[in-house]
């Protein structure tokens, strides 16, 4: 067992070491990581990290929700599902084994009950969108107080419900976790007595009759979340109490945008990458991330839509036109940080990269 001589918290300056990998469902594996120094993990339940995966063609940056809770700080777990055509997750399933060390960036994200405390919760998820819900439910379970959570997860088949055993174990110990599984079809040659079909308003009323009184958290593919939003709004739910996690872009937030200056494709800009000693020219409509790649530099990035915050760098000179989707805080912007993936240089800009 790891001995902790002094309590300290992990930071992303230190790599993560894979200590176990656990199969969960078809093409789904939970990877458990520890800090080589023995540092503990401190994060909000529901947050994510971005992993730098050393793939043969060059590093890949992929963002994954932390499926463990901060109430269990000796390890950080990530539960991933390899989709058709996926490269990063498939690389993890095929190549990431016990003893390997990889770089991680984070934790980050505001999708957490920490920011929206309530007496009663309704967690609605589909597929791998279950992972932040598991983390938040585990944190409530570990708090020592009985929670009030209706936990709905939708999957194609019962065998594809991710982390089902973990959730059913917690639900078997206390009465405050009410699990509702919804599948499109049963597994061959296996009976299924739970809900079947696509999530809809009728199911919602049956599974959580007091949904109007609950704080709602939703995570899953965008079509699924859109259906949930429309169902709740159509039933008169107060949508200010609805929260969702998504890695697809929504209308952006403009930051650090001079009122009288707009990027022009005909105008040239100059970007100085101070740490690399490289200066390059580009159009004002190119992003700083694209300019860095064209110059042969690597700025870690994940979603490339201003959501995950992986490409955050400090701007030391000049102005940029940045339109993001929640991947950077107002405090970071005030401190001079920008997101390279959605920041366009105006005239001359210098960044620490």
Curated annotation (Swiss-Prot):
[2Fe-2S] cluster binds at residues 303, 308, 311, 341. Its cofactor is FAD; [2Fe-2S] cluster. InterPro entries: 2Fe-2S_ferredoxin-like_sf, 2Fe-2S_ferredoxin-type, 2Fe2S_fd_BS, Beta-grasp_dom_sf, Cbr1-like_FAD-bd_dom, FAD-bd_FR_type, FNR_nucleotide-bd, MRET. GO terms for molecular function: 2 iron, 2 sulfur cluster binding; oxidoreductase activity. Residues 11-114 form the FAD-binding FR-type domain. The system is probably composed of an oxygenase subunit (Stc2) and two reductase subunits (Stc3 and Stc4). In the N-terminal section; belongs to the FAD-binding oxidoreductase type 6 family. This is Stachydrine N-demethylase reductase subunit Stc4. Pfam families: FAD_binding_6, Fer2, NAD_binding_1. Its EC number is 1.-.-.-. Residues 269-353 form the 2Fe-2S ferredoxin-type domain. Disruption phenotype: In strain Sm2011, the insertion mutant cannot grow on stachydrine but it can grow on N-methyl proline. Keywords: 2Fe-2S, FAD, Flavoprotein, Iron, Iron-sulfur, Metal-binding, Oxidoreductase, Plasmid. It comes from the Bacteria. The gene is stc4. Binds 1 FAD per subunit. Binds 1 2Fe-2S cluster. Signal peptide: none annotated. Reductase involved in the catabolism of stachydrine (L-proline betaine), a source of carbon and nitrogen. Part of a Rieske-type oxygenase system that catalyzes the demethylation of stachydrine to produce N-methyl-L-proline (monomethylproline). This subunit is probably involved in the transfer of electrons from NAD(P)H to the catalytic subunit Stc2.
């Amino acid at each position: 067992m790891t001995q902790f001589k002094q309590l300290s918290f992990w930071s992303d300056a230190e790599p993560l070491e894979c200590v176990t990998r656990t199969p969960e469902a078809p093409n789904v594996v939970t990877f458990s990581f520890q800090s080589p120094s023995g540092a503990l993990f401190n994060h909000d339940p529901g947050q994510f990290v971005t992993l730098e995966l050393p793939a043969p063609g060059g590093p890949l940056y992929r963002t994954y929700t932390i499926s463990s809770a901060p109430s269990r700080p000796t390890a950080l777990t990530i539960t991933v599902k390899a989709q058709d055509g996926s490269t990063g997750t498939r690389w993890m399933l095929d190549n990431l084994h016990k003893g390997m060390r990889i770089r991680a960036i984070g934790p980050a994200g505001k999708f957490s009950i920490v920011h929206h405390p309530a007496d009663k919760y309704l967690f609605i998820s589909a597929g791998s969108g279950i992972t932040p819900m598991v983390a938040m439910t585990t944190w409530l379970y570990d708090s020592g107080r009985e929670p009030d959570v209706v936990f709905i997860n939708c999957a194609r088949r019962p065998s594809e419900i991710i982390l089902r055993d973990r959730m059913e174990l917690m639900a078997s110990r206390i009465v405050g976790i009410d699990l509702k599984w919804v599948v499109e079809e049963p597994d061959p040659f296996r009976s299924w007595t739970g809900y079947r079909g696509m999530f809809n308003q009728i199911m919602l009323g049956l599974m959580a009759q007091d949904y109007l009184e609950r704080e709602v958290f939703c995570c899953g593919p965008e079509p699924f979340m859109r259906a949930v939003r429309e169902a709740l709004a159509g039933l008169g739910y107060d949508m200010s109490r609805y929260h969702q996690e998504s890695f697809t872009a929504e209308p952006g937030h403009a930051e650090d945008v001079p009122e009288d200056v707009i990027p022009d494709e005909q105008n040239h800009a100059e970007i100085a990458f101070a740490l690399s000693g490289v200066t390059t020219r580009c159009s004002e409509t190119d992003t700083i991330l694209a300019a860095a790649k064209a110059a042969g530099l690597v700025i870690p990035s994940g979603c490339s839509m201003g959501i995950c915050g992986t490409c955050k760098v400090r701007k030391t000179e000049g102005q940029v036109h940045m339109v993001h989707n929640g991947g950077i805080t107002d405090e970071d912007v005030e401190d001079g940080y920008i997101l390279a993936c959605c920041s366009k240089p105006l005239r001359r800009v210098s960044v620490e990269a």
